[in-house]
């Protein structure tokens, strides 16, 4: 299903199917849902919510310089960092919802390394973003 934001700051929630979500402009919160989703925040400081049941999400335009961040929805406090420090390839840390691992992979074969977050067998890929570009304050909720 294609879901398009209005260009204002909003919360956009996907379905249990495979969704293509585009937040457009604005500081959006994007929750893919249980399906295999492609998430694009657009301009603004966007928050991409990664749940333990998210299955498989790909974020196409993650940009920490714009203020983008990932929220791990695992039952912890969304204002508390799930991990404090710089992320790196092979890092593993425990959260309330399970173990989160960080990997550096070329997900789409374009020759650019991407970040893979894995929780309990579910994956989120941040295209064009290295783990070293993320810090603990970018990964919230634990």
Language-model-detected regions and their locations in the chain:
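Glycine- and aspartate-rich repeat motifs characteristic of hemolysin/RTX-like Ca2+-binding segments
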Residues: 1-58, 116-118, 132-142
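Acidic glycine/aspartate-rich repeat arrays in secreted/surface proteins
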Residues: 45-142
